[in-house]
C-alpha cells in the first residue's frame, strides 16, 4: 500500500494514498462533522458540513470525498471553516421544523448536536419562504415527516443499498424533497418495511410508528392478560439505549424491567426460535427426502418475505411455510398456553419486542391467527422498549438480573444465535445433520456460516449426501442469489436470507448509533459476538433438545410437521404488486 505524507492542523501524518481527508483526520484522532456521509453507502458531499481548508486551494473542500495526496496541508478548525459550518447549519434550519422538544430524536439528533456545538440559535437568521412538507403515515411500520428532512439523502442511499429504491429525491431546486415514486404514499409502493432508512437518518424525518401507548393501555386494563416476549438480539442491544457498551448482554435486567412495566408474563422469543428450527428442519428433511422444491429458503425475516412477495412472486414455493419465531411464540401463547392457564385467547394481549420494524407489518399479515385472534397484537422495536423503560422512571443499569417465566422462557443456545446472520442456518444444521446422520454431533460450531459477509457458502457431507447451503444478509445480496435460483444456477439445498445487512443485530428497530460510530465501528460484529458468547454458555445448544419444546409436542402438537403443527405454526404467502 502506497503511503503519502500530509499535515492535518500542522501535525505530520503518513496515511494510505487515495483515502479521503475525513478518514485521514480520523486516523489522527480528529473528528470532522458530517450529516450526509455513510461509509461505502452515501459518499456524495451533499451536506457541506465537512468543509475544510486545504493549503493552496481556492475554496473550502468536502472532506468526505476529497482524496489526500503527497504534501497536502489540511486545516479542520479555522475561523473560516467554523463560520462556513455554522452558516450551513443556519441555512438547513431555515426550512426545518424546529419542534425539537417533542421530536422522537431529541437527544440523539445529529443536527441538534451540531447546532449545539456551533452555538446556532433558534432565531432563524435565514428564515423565509417554507415549502409544503409532506407527512406520510400510511405505512403500518413507520412515518415520514419531511418537515424534519435535511435532504442528506442517507435514506435514499440506504434504500438503494437494499436494492429497493422506493424513495428518492423528487423535484428540483427549492422544491426538492424526498418521496416515493410518482408521489405515492409508502403503503402503495414496494417498501419492505426493513427500517434501514430509519437507523441511518440523522434527524427525526423517518421513524417507527410508536405503539407504546396502546401497550400501556392494555397493561392497565384489568380485563387483559398481557404477555411479552423478547427476540434473541434484544438482550445484546437494549443496553445501548442506556449508554452501555455495544454488545453488552443485559438479558437479566431486561426481564426485570419488563416485569416492572407491568407485564403479566415475560417470555423469551428464543422458545419460538427453537420451535421454528424443529419445524423448519423437519420441513427441509421432508423436501430433501421426498423431492420437494429446493432450495428451501428461511422465512424468519419479514422484510425478506415482503421483498420476495413484491419482487419474486413466482418463487414463493421456495419459502419455508414456517411462521417466524415472533409469530410462533404468539400462536403458542394464545393456543396451548391459554388452554393450560384457562384464559380465553381474546383476553390475551401478546407483545413482541423485536429488532425489526417489518415485524409491525408481520403482525397484520394474513394467516397469522391460529387461535382466531392475531398471534401477536403489538410488535415494539428495541427503541420503543427503551423509551418505555425510561419514561417509567426505571433505573435500568441498577436493576437486578431476573429470569424469564416458564414454560416459554426455556430455550437453547441455537435460538440465541438467531440474531446474527448465519445463526438460523447454524441452528438448523445442528438439528438437521443429527437427524440425517442419526449420530450426535462432535462439534456444534458451524463457523463457515458465521461472519458479517453478505453472502457465505458452505457444503457438508452427511451419510454420503452433500448438503450445500448459502447464508445471505441484505436484500441486494438476496437479489443476487434469487437471480441464480431463478435461472437455475443455484445448486444449494438450503438458503438463509435476512433482510438487514448482518441480520437482526442490525435491524431497523435497533438503537440508533451516531453516524460516526456506524462509519468506524462494526456494530454487527460486536453485537453478534455477544450472542455467540451467550450460546457457548448455554447448557443446551440444540433446538430439538429443548425440554419446553418437547413438552409442547407431547401435550399439544403431536410431532413436527403434524396436522396440528401446520394449523398453529405454519403460514402462506401472497404475490404483492410493486405499485397500487
What spans do the regions from the language model cover?
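Conserved glycine-bearing catalytic or ligand-binding loops at nucleotide- and phosphate-handling centers
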Residues: 199
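Iron-sulfur-associated redox domains of electron-transfer enzymes in respiratory
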Residues: 5, 12, 17-77, 81, ...
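Fe-S ferredoxin-like electron-transfer domains
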Residues: 48-193, 206-221, 225
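Basic (Lys/Arg-enriched) interaction patch that binds polyanionic ligands
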Residues: 196
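A short, structure-level motif marking secondary-structure boundaries and short turns
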Residues: 5-8, 97, 139-142, 181-183, ...
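Terminal leader/tail segments of proteins
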Residues: 1-2
Amino acid at each position: 500500500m502506497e503511503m503519502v505524507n500530509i499535515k492535518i492542523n500542522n501535525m505530520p501524518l503518513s496515511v494510505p494514498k487515495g483515502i479521503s481527508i475525513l478518514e485521514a483526520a480520523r486516523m489522527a484522532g480528529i473528528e470532522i462533522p458530517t450529516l450526509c456521509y455513510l461509509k461505502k453507502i452515501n459518499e456524495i458531499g451533499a451536506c457541506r458540513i465537512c468543509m475544510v481548508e486545504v493549503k493552496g486551494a481556492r475554496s473550502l473542500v468536502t472532506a468526505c470525498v476529497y482524496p489526500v495526496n503527497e504534501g497536502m496541508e489540511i486545516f479542520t478548525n479555522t475561523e473560516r471553516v467554523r463560520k462556513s459550518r455554522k452558516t450551513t447549519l443556519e441555512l438547513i434550519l431555515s426550512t426545518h421544523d424546529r419542534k425539537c422538544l417533542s421530536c422522537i430524536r431529541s437527544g440523539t439528533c445529529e443536527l441538534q448536536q451540531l447546532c449545539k456545538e456551533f452555538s446556532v440559535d433558534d432565531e432563524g437568521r435565514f428564515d423565509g419562504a417554507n415549502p409544503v412538507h409532506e407527512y406520510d403515515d400510511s405505512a403500518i411500520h413507520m412515518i415520514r415527516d419531511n418537515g424534519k428532512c435535511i435532504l442528506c439523502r442517507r435514506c435514499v442511499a440506504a434504500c438503494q443499498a437494499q436494492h429497493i429504491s422506493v424513495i428518492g429525491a423528487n423535484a428540483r431546486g427549492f422544491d426538492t424533497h424526498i418521496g416515493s415514486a410518482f408521489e405515492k404514499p409508502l403503503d402503495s409502493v414496494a417498501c419492505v418495511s426493513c427500517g434501514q432508512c430509519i437507523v441511518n437518518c440523522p434527524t427525526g424525518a423517518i421513524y417507527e410508528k410508536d405503539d407504546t401507548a396502546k401497550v400501556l393501555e392494555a397493561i392497565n386494563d384489568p380485563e387483559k392478560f398481557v404477555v411479552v416476549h423478547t427476540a434473541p438480539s434484544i438482550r445484546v442491544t437494549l443496553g445501548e439505549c442506556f449508554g452501555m457498551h455495544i454488545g453488552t448482554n443485559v438479558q437479566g435486567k431486561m426481564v426485570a424491567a419488563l416485569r416492572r412495566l407491568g407485564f403479566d408474563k415475560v417470555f423469551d422469543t428464543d422458545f419460538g426460535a427453537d420451535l421454528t428450527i424443529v419445524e423448519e428442519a423437519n420441513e427441509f428433511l421432508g423436501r430433501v427426502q421426498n423431492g420437494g422444491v429446493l432450495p428451501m429458503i428461511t422465512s424468519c425475516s419479514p422484510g425478506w418475505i415482503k421483498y420476495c412477495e413484491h419482487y419474486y412472486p413466482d418463487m414463493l414455493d421456495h419459502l419455508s411455510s414456517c411462521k417466524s419465531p415472533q409469530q410462533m411464540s404468539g400462536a403458542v401463547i394464545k393456543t396451548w398456553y391459554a388452554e393450560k392457564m384457562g384464559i380465553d385467547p381474546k383476553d390475551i394481549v401478546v407483545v413482541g419486542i423485536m429488532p425489526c420494524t417489518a415485524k409491525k407489518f408481520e403482525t397484520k399479515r394474513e394467516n397469522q391467527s391460529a387461535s382466531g385472534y392475531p398471534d401477536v397484537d403489538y410488535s415494539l422495536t428495541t427503541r420503543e422498549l427503551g423509551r418505555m423503560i425510561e419514561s417509567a422512571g426505571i433505573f435500568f443499569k441498577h436493576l437486578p438480573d431476573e429470569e424469564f417465566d416458564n414454560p416459554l422462557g426455556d430455550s437453547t443456545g441455537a435460538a440465541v444465535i438467531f440474531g446474527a446472520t448465519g445463526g438460523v442456518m447454524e441452528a438448523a444444521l445442528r438439528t438437521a445433520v443429527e437427524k440425517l446422520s442419526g449420530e450426535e454431533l462432535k462439534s456444534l460450531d458451524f463457523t463457515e456460516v458465521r461472519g458479517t459477509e453478505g453472502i457465505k457458502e458452505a457444503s457438508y457431507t452427511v451419510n454420503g449426501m452433500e448438503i450445500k447451503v448459502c447464508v445471505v444478509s441484505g436484500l441486494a445480496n438476496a437479489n443476487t442469489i434469487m437471480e441464480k435460483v431463478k435461472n437455475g444456477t443455484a445448486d444449494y439445498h438450503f438458503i438463509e436470507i435476512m433482510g438487514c445487512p448482518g441480520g437482526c443485530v442490525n435491524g431497523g428497530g435497533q438503537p440508533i448509533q451516531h453516524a460516526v460510530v456506524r462509519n468506524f465501528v462494526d456494530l454487527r460484529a460486536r453485537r453478534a459476538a455477544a450472542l455467540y458468547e451467550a450460546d457457548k454458555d448455554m447448557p443446551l445448544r440444540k433446538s430439538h433438545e429443548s425440554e419446553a419444546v418437547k413438552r409442547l409436542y407431547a401435550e399439544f402438537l403431536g410431532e413436527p410437521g403434524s396436522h396440528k403443527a401446520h394449523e398453529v405454526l405454519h403460514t402462506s404467502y401472497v404475490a404483492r404488486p410493486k405499485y397500487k
